[in-house]
Amino acid sequence: MRYLPKSESERRQMLEACGVSTPEELFAHLPDAVRLNRPLNLAPGISEYEIVQYFRERAEQNANGYASFLGAGVYNHYRPVLVDTVVSRGEFLTSYTPYQAEIAQGTLTTIFEFQTMICQLTGMDVANASMYDGSTAVPEAAMMAVRATGKGRVLISRTVHPEYREVLGTYAKHQGMPVQEFGYVAESGGLDLEDLERKMDDLTGAVIIQTPNFFGIVEQVKAAAEIAHKRGALLVVIFTEAVSLGLLEPPADADIVAGELQSFAISPSYGGPYAGIIAVKEKYIRQVPGRLVGQSLDSRGNRAFCLTLSTREQHIRREKATSNICTNQALIALMATVFMTVYGKQGLRELAEQNLAKAHYLASKLKPRFTGKFFNEFVVRAEGQTPEELNKQLLKKKIIGGLPLGRFYPELADSYLVCATEMTRRADMDALVAATTAQPATETVEVTA
């Protein structure tokens, strides 16, 4: 049976039809002796996530539940039930690219709302109708910057996700686009702005950074923008943890923002599908890859939506196209749209604050390697054993530990990247600390369970 809530005006109409002014009058004929004149002895209301977590804990008495502290570009966030309810509707689930606008107004409307919300989150003027994922959005953003500036060289920070850098390298190799990396500060884990300035030249068309970066550190976007713009390059800012946008200042100093929306109700999955985005300042709108949905008027003067710009090779001549994005990602983008709608501006901020609080609670017991400010993940040194050996021990305790960094950063072979989200329970964090260190915590941080 569906639950159909009633508005206050609807309640008044129903009471008037019954000839009463309050719901209590409907029960006035019942003797006081049989009426309950106190509130029911019920616990306070809890959120949907807490209800699911309550029953999951009961179910885990008969199952093997592992606590996970993995992040590194794919994050364990709660997925509201409403997301599946909406995206499983046939008109969304079975539809393809909305080539014929007159019969695809529903799909086009949701894409338009998606673009609007992405612009609000990123501080940009225009957002496209999604990309394959964050990793492929990065080279698309780099090529876009090269086209816009007429300069073919790209500088990218070593604090950008290593696998994103690999994807960029694959694209760049076949585009004849030279890519050079610049370093990070060993103490803070953030951008080495002096190294960036040394490597900048008049042939550089794009500077690419990530915030929060791969180590979880919040980067100096404004300072990087000043260095890039001084030499006529565009600044591309990447994000892999979209929830951070609910709390951190939007990267409005960037020219292009590219990122991954997996955190917005897209389940962690090896190989995807995920949803990437590119958002830009308005003057670069004609360089944006993929599709843009715009608002217009139909022949009767009614509001209507259409594909305003479609610079992909299915729509225009191949040599004129900006990209070869072909798979319809609108369904995955719809998941993120429903997520953003369910949480709203304040809800997303509260979600981000929960992530921040839990990660800092964990950091108060595990000493972070870097001094830079971080969001919901940070780097820790493994004491007395390698991160790989530590993870083997943790698995025996039903704990999936952090990501060993040696495979990506040889200089950090003794360290691992650990993440905490709103899904991370305090008991699990305490268990991780107990399993990794014998040192008691000296700092107390308030955090909800």
From Swiss-Prot:
It catalyses: N(6)-[(R)-lipoyl]-L-lysyl-[glycine-cleavage complex H protein] + glycine + H(+) = N(6)-[(R)-S(8)-aminomethyldihydrolipoyl]-L-lysyl-[glycine-cleavage complex H protein] + CO2. One of its GO terms (biological process) is nucleoside metabolic process. It is an enzyme of class 1 (oxidoreductase). It comes from the Bacteria. Keywords: Oxidoreductase. GO terms for molecular function: glycine dehydrogenase (decarboxylating) activity. InterPro entries: GcvPA (IPR023010), GDC-P_N (IPR049315), GDC_P (IPR020581), PyrdxlP-dep_Trfase (IPR015424), PyrdxlP-dep_Trfase_major (IPR015421), PyrdxlP-dep_Trfase_small (IPR015422). Its EC number is 1.4.4.2. Belongs to the GcvP family. N-terminal subunit subfamily. NCBIfam families: PRK00451.1. The glycine cleavage system is composed of four proteins: P, T, L and H. In this organism, the P 'protein' is a heterodimer of two subunits. The glycine cleavage system catalyzes the degradation of glycine. The P protein binds the alpha-amino group of glycine through its pyridoxal phosphate cofactor; CO(2) is released and the remaining methylamine moiety is then transferred to the lipoamide cofactor of the H protein. HAMAP family: GcvPA. This is Probable glycine dehydrogenase (decarboxylating) subunit 1. It comes from Solibacter usitatus (strain Ellin6076). The lineage of its organism: Bacteria, Pseudomonadati, Acidobacteriota, Terriglobia, Bryobacterales.
